[in-house]
């Protein structure tokens, strides 16, 4: 389909080079779908200019509000950056695209991955504790939201927005994984 895209998120200016590198990797492997980038008002004009200079179309979205309890929980765990990645949820609302393959901006694409567009909605990568042999990750079976295949649906997006408040009172991680795994 013509309206399929790779999508990434620029959650802070610090990841600008990662977005540019991701685009160059996709071009190097001759990906047939364009890369677009979600940004919000916290991204500087300079970072947006770098994206434009490198031919990366950016899409401005409002900041998704998350409860203070989640923000504080993430900061205490030393993962305050997780508070910005809720912006990924916008991909579920972007019905102008028939399918989105979401890639974190720090993903290294080594070969063409266009076949991901043939995968069904909510195909996600599982963290690879056994492959990497990291003992503290043993038994981890939840999704890694760094690579996802999404068929956008406004109703699903609205339901996910409701889940954010629900998860504020739960003793979980306060991550996008909590929201997606509950669907």
Region roles according to the model:
Residues 1-183:
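Glycosyltransferase catalytic domains, chiefly GT-A lineage
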């Amino acid at each position: 389909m013509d309206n399929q895209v790779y999508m990434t998120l620029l959650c802070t200016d610090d990841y600008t080079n990662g977005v540019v590198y991701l685009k160059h990797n996709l071009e190097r492997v001759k990906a047939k779908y364009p890369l677009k980038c979600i940004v919000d008002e916290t991204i500087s004009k300079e970072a947006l200019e770098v994206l434009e200079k490198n031919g990366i179309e950016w899409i401005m979205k409002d900041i998704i509000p998350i409860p203070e309890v989640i923000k504080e929980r993430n900061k205490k765990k030393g993962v305050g950056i997780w508070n910005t990645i809720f912006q990924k949820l916008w991909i579920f609302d972007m019905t102008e695209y028939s399918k989105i393959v979401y890639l974190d901006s720090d993903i290294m694409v080594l070969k063409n991955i266009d076949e991901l567009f043939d995968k069904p909605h909510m195909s996600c990568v599982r963290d690879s504790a056994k492959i990497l042999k990291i003992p503290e990750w043993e038994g981890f079976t939840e999704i890694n939201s760094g690579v996802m295949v999404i068929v956008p649906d406004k109703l699903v997006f609205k339901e996910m927005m409701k889940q954010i408040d629900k998860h504020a009172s739960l003793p979980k991680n306060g991550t996008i994984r909590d929201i997606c795994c509950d669907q």
